[in-house]
Amino acid sequence: MAAALWGFFPVLLLLLLSGDVQSSEVPGAAAEGSGGSGVGIGDRFKIEGRAVVPGVKPQDWISAARVLVDGEEHVGFLKTDGSFVVHDIPSGSYVVEVVSPAYRFDPVRVDITSKGKMRARYVNYIKTSEVVRLPYPLQMKSSGPPSYFIKRESWGWTDFLMNPMVMMMVLPLLIFVLLPKVVNTSDPDMRREMEQSMNMLNSNHELPDVSEFMTRLFSSKSSGKSSSGSSKTGKSGAGKRR
């Protein structure tokens, strides 16, 4: 009977070993079916780059700056040399921007494939189909300080002179004063044309007639000239009589 027991013991040992081997192979097969070839949906990647402000040391502004990926879905911080790394990002398309209260940076779109390939391009909200490639890792350069306020305009004499109300009052006055001196008013045809043109402009009947004003203006000058001429002729005639 002891010999029978010793003969049954190796068979029992083989059965136990075969059961352990099968149980260890089943989890491996399940893991292989869900994970694929090692790069699957659950894999995460990182976005790298560097932010630069021309003429300013990184230590002067990086403490208040942040790196935002798709708003605040992923947040990164800048190192002392201006470089940054944002971890744990799945494949997809993301807008990466450096946010700083003192400097402005243009956003960049980064496309990550399922195999981990990176492609960076400008963000164009107007022409979305236009693609302008950028080097990767990202090199984000500041375009200057942001303009939070509009500069207040200073008052000048040109603003006063170019006011429409001032121009409406000054220009007619200049025309009435300078035009008789420039144009030959002794010509009756020229005077008649000027009166007709001014009457065409004077569409409001409540205002005084411009032609009457021009006639009085020119007639006063002509009468003054004639009176001065007659006085001169009278004096010359009196001299001759003497």
From Swiss-Prot:
Signal peptide: 1-23
GO CC, alphabetical: EMC complex; endoplasmic reticulum membrane; membrane
Any GO molecular function: carbohydrate binding
Taxonomy, superkingdom: Eukaryota
UniProt biased composition (Low complexity): 219-235
Cytoplasmic side: 181-242
Subunit structure: Component of the ER membrane protein complex (EMC).
Descriptive protein name: Endoplasmic reticulum membrane protein complex subunit 7
Protein species of origin: Homo sapiens (Human)
Gene symbol of the encoding locus: EMC7
